[in-house]
C-alpha cells in the first residue's frame, strides 16, 4: 500500500542515476578515438586535480564531479584490455558502490567487472583502495583479471595471499588498489597492532573498501571473531578422560520441562547448541572421574565434560569438520569449504580431537581479537555487492549504516522456480532427487544438485552410481576441493551432473554448453605441467576427477601422463594443433627452464595469455596464440552444445534441503538462468530435515501424523510452505539476535581497543615519547596524593610519611624527599610540588642513561610502554572474557547483563590503564643499562 502511495524508493534511487549514465554514454564517443597513452594520461590528470584538494573531505566533491569521465575511461579500458564493455546497469552498480552502499546484482551480471569502476575512481586519491573477496583463489583471479584494467590505466595493483612475508605485504598494501580476503585484512590489522617496531607495520590508513559477496562476510561470518592467540599448556589426559565419560553418558530423548530433569544423563538443545548435565548425569560423571565436585576450582572438570558432550552430539564429522592428515579441519557451514588453520576456541577443538582419537594440540590464549563488524566499520567509506542482500537489508542498515540498492538485470530473467516437493521421510526424498536428476540428464540438460553436507553429497553420489549416471562431486573433501573451478566450468555442458556442497563454486559462473575459455586454459595447463613445473609441485591432477558409473573415482592423471580422458573436453584437438602444443612446450622449456616454475607461476602465465592485455613478451604471445587456437576448436563444438542445452531448457538446479537462511537458498537458485538464460529450480525437502525438526516445532510433528500418505508421494501444501518460511524467518531472527549481541558486546571492547591501539601507534611512531612518560608520572603522583590525602581533614592530620614513602617506591631518585618538605601544602599545591620533583628526577635519569648511549632513553621508553600495553591488554582480554561468561547469570537478578558488562568492563579498563602508567614509571626509574664493555687491546 505504501509503495503505491509513495512509489518504490529503489526505483526513485535508480532514476537519480539515469542522467549520469547518459553523460557517460555521451563521453564514450570522445574517449573512443584516444590512443592508449592518451587514455593513460587521463589518470595523471585526475590525480593532479585531486592532489590539489588536500584532505579526503575536500576530495570527495571532486570525485563526484569527475565520476562520469572516470567511468567512461574505465569502460574504454575494459573494452581494450578484456574485450568487455560495461553495460549501463553495471555503471549504475558502480555509482551505488561509490556512494558507499550495497549493490544487489543477480548472478552472472558481472559484479567483478562493476568493482573496477569505483575502485579506479577512489584509487585516484592515492590513499589506497581494498577490494575484498571470500577466498585466496578469487582474490588472485580478480587481481590478475580485473587488475589488468587498472594497470593499463597506470595504477598499481597489489594482492595479499596467505603465505606472504611482511615486506611483500607492505609493498602490496602500498599499491593503489589491493585485492585481499577479509581474514587476511583483519589479521594484518591485528598483527600491525602487536608490532614491536614501526618497520613491522604493513597496512596504511584505511580509506575505501569494496566487498564482493558482502552478505557472506558481513553477515555469515559476523558471529566468528578474528583471534590471534598464543599457546597455553593444559593437561591432555583431561580431554581424553572427558571424551570417555561423554561416550558412557546417555542423551535424554527430549528436553526437560518446568525445571524437571528429563530421563537420561544430559539434554541437548540443538537450537542453542548447548548440552546440560542432569542431576543424575552429574553424579555419574563425578563417580567415573573419582571426584567430589565437577566445579572444584582446584581441579575443574565441568568445562571439559560439557565440551566433550558437545563434540559427541553437536559437532558431526563430515558436516561440521573433516579429518585430514591427523587433524580435525573445520568446514564452513555456509560455503562448504574447509578452513585449514582455523580452530574452535575454549577447548572445543581439543574435545573433538579427543573424540576422534587424534593428537591433541595445545589450547590457546587470546592475544588480540576483533569482529568483522567492527573491523569493516574502521573504513571511512564501505561498499559491497552480492546477488542476495534484500533479505538482510535491515541488518545492513542497523549494524553498518549501509543502504541496499537493487540494480536491475541487463536482460529479463527467464528462470522458472518450480514448487517445492516435500516427502515424509529422508529416504524417499533422496530417491526422488536421484530420479529427477536422471530424468533431466536424459533430456540433455545439465543438472546442479546442492547438498548441505559432505555425507549427503556422497549418499546421492552412490544413488546416481547405481543408475550409472556419470557425475562430478564438489565438496570439502581435499580430493574434490582443489578441482572446484574446473568442475564448475564443466557444469553447464549437455547432460552434465554436478553435486555441490553448499554451492562451494560461487565465483565461477556456470556457462551453458561449457566454459570454452576455461577448458582451453585447462588443456594448456595439462600439456605444459609435466614439462615446466617443479616435480614436487606435480601432485595436483590437472583435470577434475569425474565419478564414473561403475568405477568410482577415475585414476588421477599425473603430470607426465598422456592427455586425460577426452570426455573432459568438448572435442579431440586436430593433429596440427596437437603438434603446435608439443612444439610450444619444447620452446617454453628452452625459454623458462626444464621444470623450473611453481604451479602458481605457470597458472599466472596461462591466465595472462588467456586475456587481451597488450604484451611484448614473445613467450606469452606464443602461449596466447596457442590458447586462442585451442579455444577456437573447442568453441565450434561448445556453441552447438550451448544451442542444444538452451533448446532443452537450460540448467536445472535442485536444492535438497532448505538452508537456515533464505539468502543461501536464493544463491543456489541464482546459479540457473544467468543473464537471461533459460533454466529451472526445485527444492526437495523431507519432514526430517534439520530446519523443520529443530525450528519447525510441534506444528510440523502434527503435520507428519496428519499426512497419511505413501512415503514416495510428494506433499504440496500451502500450510507446509508457510511453516517452512516461518521456520526460516525464525532462524534468521535467532541468528540476527546472536550477531547483534556479539556486536553489542564487542562494541564495548571496540572503544577500549581503539584507545589502546591508538596509544600503541603513537608510541610506535615515536611521537613525543618523553612527554608521554612524564604525563604518566604526573598522573601517578596525582593518584598517590588522592589515595593518601583526605581533603575533608585539615593538612596537619594528613599521613605525609606514608605518602612520601609511596612516592619513593616509584621514584628512587627522590630518596632525599622528607615529609617535612610537603607539610603545610594544600592538595593542589602538593600535586604541583610532586609533579615538579618527578620532572626533575626524570631529567636526572635521562642524563644518566644518555651517557651510556645517545638515544637509549627513547628506546627504553618505547620498549617499556609497548611491553606493559601488550602484557596488560592480554590479561585484560582474558578478564573481559571471564566477565562476559559470568554476567549472563545476572539476568536472573533482574539486571541487564550488557549494562553490567559495560560498567564493570569500563572500571576494569581504567584500572588496566592506571596499572600500565604506574608500571612504566616504575620500570623507567629502575632501568639500569649495562655499561658498554671496553674492547681489549
Curated annotation (Swiss-Prot):
Keywords: ATP-binding, Cell inner membrane, Cell membrane, Cytoplasm, Membrane, Nucleotide-binding, Protein transport, Thylakoid, Translocase, Translocation, Transport. It is an enzyme of class 7 (translocase). The keyword Signal does not apply. InterPro entries: Helicase_ATP-bd, P-loop_NTPase, SecA, SecA_CS, SecA_DEAD, SecA_motor_DEAD, SecA_preprotein_X-link_dom, SecA_SF2_C. Its EC number is 7.4.2.8. CDD domains: DEXDc_SecA, SF2_C_secA. One of its GO terms (biological process) is intracellular protein transmembrane transport. It catalyses: ATP + H2O + cellular proteinSide 1 = ADP + phosphate + cellular proteinSide 2. It is found in: Cell inner membrane; Cellular thylakoid membrane; Cytoplasm. ATP binds at residues 90, 108-112, 509. Signal peptide: none annotated. GO terms for cellular component: cell envelope Sec protein transport complex; cytosol; plasma membrane-derived thylakoid membrane. It holds the Pfam family SecA_DEAD. The keyword Ribonucleoprotein does not apply. It is a peripheral membrane protein. GO terms for molecular function: ATP binding; protein-exporting ATPase activity. It comes from the Bacteria. Monomer and homodimer. Part of the essential Sec protein translocation apparatus which comprises SecA, SecYEG and auxiliary proteins SecDF. Other proteins may also be involved. NCBIfam families: secA. Belongs to the SecA family. Part of the Sec protein translocase complex. Interacts with the SecYEG preprotein conducting channel. Has a central role in coupling the hydrolysis of ATP to the transfer of proteins into and across the cell membrane, serving as an ATP-driven molecular motor driving the stepwise translocation of polypeptide chains across the membrane. Probably participates in protein translocation into and across both the cytoplasmic and thylakoid membranes in cyanobacterial cells. This is Protein translocase subunit SecA. The gene is secA.
